[in-house]
């Protein structure tokens, strides 16, 4: 009842004050102006958003010269920094702070301060703005302290218009409400992009609500909630995604580039490989053509099956390589007798015969027209014995013998006297050479061949000889040593019978076996005409088989070689003429080229007669006895015709 009376009294007092503004206040007493001003206590208030609040700051002193100041959260509210919805009204002895349409931003601690000459005093109160519809207002009973020092705070009572307040109880009223978007002026209530809504209630004053984004919270969306973190994470996620895309693009580009390079390399390799194959094929074809041309040039025209028994002594005087005189002497002494060694300076005769020869080149046979220069043995070589016939060391001219043995043999042959020129054997030789029935080919022309150089065509002294059967060419190196020595026919038959295995074991030649011709029938006639006795048969050993040899071309009459061999002659050699006469008389009758009728028969008979045994490669058959060598040489030397010479 007292508060109501006070309120009524206040209202009356206000009216009185308004009516009596021009009248001075009566002085109640002298002691009142001397006291410092005191402020009444202000009460804290809680209100909904959009409501109206009033804070009053009153003093018990009626001193006219008082100044009032308001502070919010320690900051003075004046015309410059106070919000638009806040107003301050000054009255004598009191001051009011009115908040129209309170919002969440208006929440805070408000303080009122009075300033006078007598002293200063202050009072504070808290204002809370609630968004919900439930509004609770609690007001505590105010206690008046009549005597409070200026230093102690002064409580100010806060009253809310339109609300019933009591000192001891707090009541809350609820009613129906609805949300309405705030006007444009009121949208500033929400910050940071929040949406403003106003709650209107019939029983309660209107209030404001804010719908904040996810990054912000608070009454007005003023608080950030992990905003920077979300932003940072978003940036990182975006950067990571961009980096991932860049990496994927980079790796893809590298793979495509490698694939393109690989394809280019494969294509280039294939092209170069084809080009190389083409070049190799061309080179091979060119090499093959060159080889075929060389082989054709070397071989000449081919004849597949020539008669192997058609044997000739091929004298080829042209060699591809220039050989020194010493090498020529050694090789010719090893292989054959040089016909220039057995002719004298006064009696020489040469003939040129063109006959088909037989040779081998790379396993093929070829027929060429060769000019065989055969020179008859002169009577100057009558006796070639190095010692007595009893059985001293005798030299033999064989395929593997050295040049020393041949030199010594030729030296002894040169030094023997010309004792067989006037012998009866020479007459027989003349008869054989001059009888028309025998048809002995005698030519009186010198050899001229494109294959023989002028220096090797004939010896230094002009001479004439009869044609002599040539020697067959052998494809084996061991048989390329033609011997102009022969044995009697009966000895040949016996030796061929005693050595069949030896002939078949060495140097098997299927061409001679398959295509060999039978021996000439003239040989049988000669065997009947010229008979020999068994006393001249030497020790049986493998007969020497003379075959057609390519090295027969080296049997060229070289006078220089003969002179060099004559320089090596030994004057101490001794010869026995009596023994050689008897042996030459018997063996000379079996010489095949003395009784031939035509060159064709000679070529057919010479092959089996002058066949060299394959046992020459056998080391045991390399040496022969002196009787056989002497018989062969004497048969050739003794039958020389002194008249024809």
Swiss-Prot record:
Q: Which Gene3D superfamilies match?
A: Immunoglobulins, Laminin
Q: Which GO terms describe its biological process?
A: cardiac conduction system development; cardiac muscle cell differentiation; cardiac muscle tissue development; cell morphogenesis; chemorepulsion involved in interneuron migration from the subpallium to the cortex; detection of temperature stimulus involved in sensory perception of pain; ERBB2-ERBB3 signaling pathway; ERBB2-ERBB4 signaling pathway
Where does the chain cross the membrane? 248-268
| Keywords, sorted A to Z | Cell membrane, Disulfide bond, EGF-like domain, Glycoprotein, Growth factor, Immunoglobulin domain, Membrane, Secreted, Transmembrane, Transmembrane helix
Q: Does the keyword Lipid biosynthesis apply?
A: no
Q: Where is the composition biased (Polar residues)?
A: 139-164
In the UniProt record, the signal sequence range is none
| GO CC, one annotated term | synapse
Which portions of the chain have biased composition (kind: Low complexity)? 165-175, 340-355, 568-579
The chain's Cytoplasmic topological domains, given as residue ranges, are 269-645
Span list, region Disordered? 1-52, 139-175, 340-364, 380-406, 433-463, 531-593
Q: Where is the EGF-like domain?
A: 178-222
One Pfam assignment: I-set
The UniProt regions of compositional bias labelled Basic residues, in chain numbering, are 547-557
Here the segments flagged for biased composition (Gly residues) are 392-402
What Gene Ontology molecular-function terms does this entry list? chemorepellent activity; ErbB-2 class receptor binding; growth factor activity; receptor ligand activity; receptor tyrosine kinase binding; transcription coregulator activity
Q: How is it modified after translation?
A: Proteolytic cleavage close to the plasma membrane on the external face leads to the release of the soluble growth factor form.
Stretches in topological domain Extracellular: 20-247
Domain comment, in the record's words? The cytoplasmic domain may be involved in the regulation of trafficking and proteolytic processing. Regulation of the proteolytic processing involves initial intracellular domain dimerization.
Function in brief: Direct ligand for ERBB3 and ERBB4 tyrosine kinase receptors. Concomitantly recruits ERBB1 and ERBB2 coreceptors, resulting in ligand-stimulated tyrosine phosphorylation and activation of the ERBB receptors.
Family label: Belongs to the neuregulin family.
Q: Give the protein's recorded name.
A: Pro-neuregulin-1, membrane-bound isoform
Organism the protein comes from: Mus musculus (Mouse)
Instruction: Name the gene.
Output: Nrg1
């Amino acid at each position: 009842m007292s508060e109501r009376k006070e309120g009524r009294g206040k209202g009356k007092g206000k009216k009185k004050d308004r009516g009596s503004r021009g009248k001075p206040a009566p002085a109640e007493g002298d002691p009142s102006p001397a006291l410092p001003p005191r402020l009444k206590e202000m009460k804290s208030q809680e209100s909904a958003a959009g409501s109206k609040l009033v804070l009053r700051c009153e003093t018990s002193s009626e001193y006219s010269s008082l100044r009032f100041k308001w502070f919010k959260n320690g900051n003075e509210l004046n015309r410059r920094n106070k919000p638009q919805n806040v107003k301050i009204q000054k009255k004598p002895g009191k001051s009011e702070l009115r908040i129209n349409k309170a919002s969440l931003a208006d929440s805070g601690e408000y303080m009122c301060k009075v300033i006078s000459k007598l002293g200063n005093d202050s009072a504070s109160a808290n204002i809370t703005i609630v968004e919900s519809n439930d509004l609770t207002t609690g007001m505590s009973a105010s206690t008046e302290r009549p005597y409070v020092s200026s230093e102690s705070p002064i409580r100010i009572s806060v009253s809310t218009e339109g609300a019933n307040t009591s000192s001891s109880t707090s009541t809350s009223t609820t009613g129906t409400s609805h949300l309405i978007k705030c006007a444009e002026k009121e949208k500033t209530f929400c910050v940071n992009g929040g949406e403003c809504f106003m709650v209107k209630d019939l029983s309660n004053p209107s209030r404001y609500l804010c719908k904040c984004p996810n990054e912000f919270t608070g009454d007005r969306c003023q608080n950030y909630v992990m905003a920077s973190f979300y932003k940072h994470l978003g940036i990182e996620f975006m950067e990571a995604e961009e980096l991932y895309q860049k990496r994927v693009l980079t790796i893809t580009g590298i793979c495509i580039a490698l694939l393109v390079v690989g394809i280019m390399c494969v294509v280039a390799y294939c092209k170069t490989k084809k080009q190389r194959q083409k070049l190799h094929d061309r080179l091979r074809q060119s090499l093959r053509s060159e080889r075929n041309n060389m082989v054709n040039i070397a071989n000449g025209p081919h004849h597949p099956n020539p008669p192997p028994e058609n044997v000739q002594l091929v004298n080829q005087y042209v060699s591809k390589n220039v050989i020194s005189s010493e090498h020529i002497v050694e090789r010719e002494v090893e292989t054959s007798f040089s016909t220039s060694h057995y002719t004298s300076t006064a009696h020489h005769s040469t003939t040129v015969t063109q006959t088909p020869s037989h040779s081998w080149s790379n396993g093929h046979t070829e027929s060429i027209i060769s000019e065989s220069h055969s020179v008859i043995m002169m009577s100057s070589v009558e006796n070639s014995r190095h010692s007595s016939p009893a059985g001293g060391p005798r030299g033999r001219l064989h395929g593997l013998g050295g040049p020393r043995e041949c030199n010594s043999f030729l030296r002894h042959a040169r030094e023997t006297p010309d004792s067989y020129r006037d012998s009866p054997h020479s007459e027989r030789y003349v008869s054989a050479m001059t009888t028309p029935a025998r048809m002995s080919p005698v030519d009186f022309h010198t050899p001229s061949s494109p294959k023989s150089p002028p220096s090797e065509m004939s010896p230094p002294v002009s001479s004439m000889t009869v044609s002599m059967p040539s020697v067959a060419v052998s494809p084996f190196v061991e048989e390329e040593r033609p011997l102009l020595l022969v044995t009697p026919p009966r000895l040949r038959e016996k030796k061929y019978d005693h050595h069949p295995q030896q002939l078949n074991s060495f140097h098997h030649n299927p061409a001679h076996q398959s295509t060999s011709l039978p021996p000439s029938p003239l040989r049988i006639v000669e065997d009947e005409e010229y008979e020999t006795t068994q006393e001249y048969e030497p020790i049986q050993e493998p007969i020497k088989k003379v075959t057609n040899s390519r090295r027969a071309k080296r049997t060229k009459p070289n006078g220089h070689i003969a002179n060099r061999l004559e320089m090596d002659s030994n004057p101490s050699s001794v010869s026995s003429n009596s023994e050689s006469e008897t042996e030459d008389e018997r063996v000379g009758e079996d010489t095949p080229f003395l009784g031939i009728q035509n060159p064709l028969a000679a070529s057919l008979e010479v092959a089996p007669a002058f066949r060299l045994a394959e046992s020459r490669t056998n080391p045991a058959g390399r040496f022969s006895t002196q009787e056989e060598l002497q018989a062969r040489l004497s048969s050739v030397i003794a039958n020389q015709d002194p008249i024809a010479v």
